[in-house]
Amino acid sequence: SYMPPKAKFTKQQIAEAGLDIIRNEGMENLTARALGKRLGSSACPIFTVFENMEEVQAEINKAARAVYSEYVKKGLKEELAFKGVGTQYIMFAIKEPRLFQLLFMSEQSQQPSVSKVLPVIDDNYEAILLSVQNCYNLSKEKSERLYKHLWIYTHGIAVLCATNMCTFTADEIANMISEVFKGTLKEIIGAEQ
């Protein structure tokens, strides 16, 4: 009897399966075999779509970034977009700890400076920076300084949450970000006078 060839999977389907594996079992369990199994097949069809496992991982990273971007977009809609984004960054770490670890806690191949890290990590960097410049009437340079301080602080909270070392309520997070933001803003504006 004639067996039609198994339907091939799209890059999107393979990436989604990869995200599932990472979410449930962790990055270390992401193998071609595990992907095939998750898709109900062998590993073979994966390599008709991708050249190798590195390409698969790049696509999964892209899919994880898309999930993260949804959080950022939500933050950008808030009245204080800058604070909104910081809060959403932490929410992403709380709700998607393994995707957060994949995107923001993996060792980098080269060590860029912080001002390079932020745009690389965040496609939304320009939008966030503009919201700071406009809301607080700051120069680009001062906005970047403010953003850098806040991002480092926010990243610290997010890492504590993503690794289950600490838990904070939404109110605590909002208050912590506000205090550091106001203090840093005062310092940066005060430096002018």
PLM feature segments, named:
Residues 58-84, 118, 123-134:
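Amphipathic alpha-helical linker/stalk segments
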Residues 10, 14-17, 64, 146:
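N-terminal positioning helix adjacent to the helix-turn-helix/winged-helix DNA-binding module
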Residues 13, 17, 21-55, 59:
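Helix-turn-helix
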Residues 110-137, 144-148, 175-189:
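Amphipathic alpha-helical packing segments from all-alpha helical-bundle domains
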Residues 1-9, 192-193:
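N-terminal intrinsically disordered/low-complexity leader segments
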